[in-house]
Amino acid sequence: MPKLRSATSTQGRNMAGARALWRATGMKENDFGKPIIAVVNSFTQFVPGHVHLKDMGQLVAREIEKAGGVAKEFNTIAVDDGIAMGHGGMLYSLPSRDLIADSVEYMVNAHCADAMVCISNCDKITPGMLMAALRLNIPCVFVSGGPMEAGKTKLSDKIIKLDLVDAMIQGANPNVSDEDSAQIERSACPTCGSCSGMFTANSMNCLTEALGLSLPGNGSCLATHADRKQLFLDAGKQVVELCKRYYEQEDDSVLPRSIANKKAFENAMSLDIAMGGSTNTVLHLLAAAQEAEVDFTMADIDRLSRQVPCLSKVAPNTQKYHMEDVHRAGGIMAILGELDRANLLHNDTRTVLGMSLAEQIAKYDIVLTKDEAVHKFFRAGPAGIRTTEAFSQDCRWDTVDDDRENGCIRSKTFAYSQDGGLAMLSGNLAMDGCIVKTAGVDESILKFTGDAIVFESQEDAVAGILGGKVQAGHVVVIRYEGPKGGPGMQEMLYPTSYLKSMGLGKACALLTDGRFSGGTSGLSIGHCSPEAAAGGLIGLVKDGDKIEIDIPNRSIQLCVAEEELAQRRAEQDKLGWQPVNRQREVSFALKVYGHFATSADKGAVRDKTKI
């Protein structure tokens, strides 16, 4: 029988000092010998996706204690990518993922915790905690803060749905009045929760369902809805059950690495492709797989992207649907159900509920079940009231959306496209691959050939776009923004948004060794690997070079003679593969991150060969 990890600090006379300190935290005599469960919270007033989490940790803790465990809460940091966007703050976003993973490991191992509940929500917090969970491999349940309600406003006598990206695009659109821009800004983000589209935060919270590490509805039930409270309560109960099964019954099938195995990672990636999720999820799944010691690579992603259709289109890929609509259509269990019926899912994987994925789909897929409680849960909808309070409303749709022909979620037969929502491209410009969200690319530019216009930083690219330097037909190349070159691999949401603001959204392509926000759409190709700072060919591109992009054939090519490229490479070798005339202060902390960072095809994790 596995011994409780916490026994190291709670048993024996030699641990009298540790027990004295445990008592000072509130533990009683009969608590020693119970599993000590870390409640890993991420509350902060900086982030709307986390502003409502202050009391969630204790909500979970009380359930843990009712079920027979001892709960101890601590907090991690949380960066708001939207607020950090467009300035030097974005350099810190991706590095914070690894810092979160390390901080969770430090706290859990230092205090010998037996299990944990991870309360996450936004872009780097869920993947950071996921990396920690798979690294530690102790019983764990994920529960997130939930999505924000979509914004709504009336413009030109028409009610329109909004999100953060609309505020950014229209704020830079010279054809939009100051009054309309201000109205959109005030209406775009009405409640607490992770931004309302299928951006990175919501994508990752959805993927935890496919990985089997969170409960059904975790990715889609609104932050404001009363139904979400039950997810927190159930997480507290379930983690104690997992502890009993592992520590008392010697059942290691409940551990994160047993649940999130190779098949589960393939399920998560298939879900991501089917729902047109954020390209950042590729980065995070690759990183998490390495923590789990799962052999999951860009080659697997390429293979899956050629098999899985696009079954759901949500903002930013359309303004018709947001996360509240995904929930009404049955949430992630519904998309997984459609993938299962198309024989595109490993349904024998396990979940934290102790079920196989097939059993969980049968119970929670609204197309399969007649259970009124399940249908009621997925009818949970928005209230349209500005608030920062969780569980503050109980509004419901009259019906669920089970239309698999024309609804938010579709069957394979009626898919938005038989080609999936994400694709990996390769060629001389990206020998180790690059990623594009095909769900956000207009059909007219799936094949695109244009002249390169090169920028050595995101800031210069923004100035070039807004200043009129970028013209229709250009391939905007933004380099030295990768994990090493940034350092920190900034998101390029402002450049892609400003291309739309300037009317160039369907007339230009953008290629970068940086990454994109989940809010990005258009012909935006990121994660170019190897990155410029690692000697990638993107570092050799010059203004006017012809670049050919062919998404259907998964190809990206720089049309320059090999002899010329060899000469350019020799010049860069002398220069040390550094950006030219870039004005950027880089802190010591970021330099450390950049020194150890691998390229995006490896998940931008630390290079262990350098340690």
UniProtKB/Swiss-Prot annotation:
GO biological process: isoleucine biosynthetic process; L-valine biosynthetic process
Residues where N6-carboxylysine is found: K124
Cofactor, how bound (note): Binds 1 [2Fe-2S] cluster per subunit. This cluster acts as a Lewis acid cofactor.
Active site: S517 (proton acceptor)
Reaction(s) catalysed by this chain's protein: (2R)-2,3-dihydroxy-3-methylbutanoate = 3-methyl-2-oxobutanoate + H2O; (2R,3R)-2,3-dihydroxy-3-methylpentanoate = (S)-3-methyl-2-oxopentanoate + H2O
Ribonucleoprotein listed as a keyword: no
Top-level class of the enzyme under EC nomenclature: lyase
Needed cofactors: [2Fe-2S] cluster; Mg(2+)
Keywords, in A-Z order: 2Fe-2S, Amino-acid biosynthesis, Branched-chain amino acid biosynthesis, Iron, Iron-sulfur, Lyase, Magnesium, Metal-binding
Stored PROSITE patterns: ILVD_EDD_1, ILVD_EDD_2
Binding site for Mg(2+): D81, D123, K124, E491
E.C. no: 4.2.1.9
GO MF entries: 2 iron, 2 sulfur cluster binding; dihydroxy-acid dehydratase activity; magnesium ion binding
Chain positions recorded as [2Fe-2S] cluster binding sites: C122, C195
GO cellular component, one term: cytosol
Alphabetized InterPro entries for the sequence: Dihydro-acid_dehy_C, DihydroxyA_deHydtase, DiOHA_6PGluconate_deHydtase_CS, ILV_EDD_C, ILV_EDD_N, IlvD/EDD_N
Involved pathway(s): Amino-acid biosynthesis; L-isoleucine biosynthesis; L-isoleucine from 2-oxobutanoate: step 3/4; Amino-acid biosynthesis; L-valine biosynthesis; L-valine from pyruvate: step 3/4
Function: Functions in the biosynthesis of branched-chain amino acids. Catalyzes the dehydration of (2R,3R)-2,3-dihydroxy-3-methylpentanoate (2,3-dihydroxy-3-methylvalerate) into 2-oxo-3-methylpentanoate (2-oxo-3-methylvalerate) and of (2R)-2,3-dihydroxy-3-methylbutanoate (2,3-dihydroxyisovalerate) into 2-oxo-3-methylbutanoate (2-oxoisovalerate), the penultimate precursor to L-isoleucine and L-valine, respectively.
Family membership noted in the UniProt record: Belongs to the IlvD/Edd family.
Record text on subunit structure and interactions: Homodimer.
Name the UniProt record assigns to this protein: Dihydroxy-acid dehydratase
Gene that encodes it: ilvD
